[in-house]
Amino acid sequence: MHMYRSHTCADLSAQDVGKTVRLSGWVHRVRDHGGVLFIDLRDHYGITQVLCDPDSPVFEQMEQVRAEWCIRVDGVVKARDASLINPKISTGEIELFVKDLEVLGASEELPLQVFGDQEYPEETRLKYRYLDLRRANMQANMKLRSDVVASLRQQMWKADFREFQTPIITASSPEGARDFLVPSRLHPGRFYALPQAPQQFKQLLMVSGFDKYFQIAPCFRDEDPRADRSPTDFYQLDIEMSFVTQQDVFDVIQPVLTQVFEQFGNGKAVDQEWPQISYKDAALWYGSDKPDLRNPIKMQSVSEHFAGSGFAIFANLLEQEGTEIRAIPAPGGGSRKFCDRMNAFAQKEGLPGMGYIFWRDQGAGMEAAGPLAKNIGPERTEAIRQQLGLGVGDAAFFLGGKPKAFETVAGKARNHIGMELGLTDQNRFAFAWIVDFPIYEKDSETGRIDFEHNPFSMPQGGLEALQGDPLSVVGYQYDLSCNGYELVSGAIRNHKPEIMFKAFEIAGYGEDEVRKRFGGMVNAFQYGAPPHGGCAAGIDRIVMLLAEEANIREVILFPMNQRAEDLMMSAPSEPESEQLMELGLRVIPKD
């Protein structure tokens, strides 16, 4: 018999009754029923009930065992009485009568219990992550993560992609976030960087003649933490292909993700049609470039109904350049109580409130109610109702100003309305491609033109497009949203040096600076670079959605906390003075 186990804690069934077996695992819980000791023994695979009575030679030893001790037991498999069968576990028809027991690893008093559903502070869970990971939900999440990564790999191999590993230590490259810098001992005063993404390397692979590349890639970004984002590192399915169009990229990644969500989505519906929505329309309709399409609400511009109206706030606002009034329909939200709740929501978001109209039954007909309805009159109110397709029992909320200033709050209000009114389908994965991202934006204070999104995407229209108004230039850049989260981001790359130099020139970067920052890639593009493009899918977010977790740290093995600290490993830590001397560094305290 094997030194530690002949079976796992999920293997045994009624067919094994009478066999002598050996199990190893952790003590999930201990119970004393009338002098008979019961232990639920747990390993990675499942739970087996083991027991012994006072006549057993290991009874006294078993009395000493406590929760989360690691033990080995030998015993005989017994059938449970029919009334004691536990259908909730795979071994529920049997129990193991212990003949021998060995303590493999005793445990000190536990800072958190593995058994049960008790909640603990996140700081405690992260400090003792190895205990937290023993809990059933965390085991399930990590198994799911492993299975998702395996499925992604298998599908990419099946599609004839080659898996390559790109460097982890490289040059600093401004890609939208702060780099983690690594000082060089051999080159004092110079620094490497951990890659924010394998962006340049995967493009260089295309120049090197490899047609289809993928990698389960670690990415490192010094970012402020959010519930859906790790502050230091994350993993992505990184993809790049040569001689492809934007639609080719969509056609590759859609079946891959569809299979993953169908396979691991717990029976939720997976949309088969993935609409392509322009960035401009996404901002107008949803107030977000990662819309949640489970919510059917579409915002609309209603400026014409308020121009010159009796509602002076909106009428005066529309006289300013670049302003707009938008409506958020709320089917089923037609009560003053709900409208007041939404006003309170807007105030929490930093607004004075939201204008609203709601429609109610007045016996002989329909009546529009609310302060806006009184100010703009029945004709304008009716025109708004017809445009939005609303009726009795419905409402509409209104925000105005320069769209960039209110779109984010409008999007949050749309999401809140959808959840409050039960309009958002909780049993569905809804996908949408967001396309036609603007390449440039103007700083409202300085008037300076800078990149709004990926500077390496090919402008639609090529070099000719860059000769006109920069703010009208859109790129072959795309994101994939699912249920309000950005899952995929990608682009068809700007592989022509002359177009790249012009694109950067518009944003104020000269050719010399571009060569200095991106010299490796720019030089390579001078030697017959093929048209190429790709994307990257965030594995952490995919698993978070599939596991129905609101916090991304629930699907990462050893995450940092909100302050980018590893409480378990005490990172970041202060270096030894000798280490600093070797690197030619000195720590200057902040005042």
From Swiss-Prot:
The record marks H33 as: Important for tRNA non-discrimination. GO terms for biological process: aspartyl-tRNA aminoacylation. L-aspartate binds at E175, R221, H453, R493. Its EC number is 6.1.1.23. Residues 199-202 are annotated as: Aspartate. ATP binds at R221, D222, E223, E486, G538, I539, D540, R541. One of its GO terms (molecular function) is aspartate-tRNA ligase activity. It is found in: Cytoplasm. It is an enzyme of class 6 (ligase). PROSITE patterns: AA_TRNA_LIGASE_II (PS50862). Gene3D superfamilies: Bira Bifunctional Protein, Domain 2, GAD-like domain, Nucleic acid-binding proteins. Homodimer. Belongs to the class-II aminoacyl-tRNA synthetase family. Type 1 subfamily. This is Aspartate--tRNA(Asp/Asn) ligase. It comes from Roseobacter denitrificans (strain ATCC 33942 / OCh 114). The lineage of its organism: Bacteria, Pseudomonadati, Pseudomonadota, Alphaproteobacteria, Rhodobacterales.
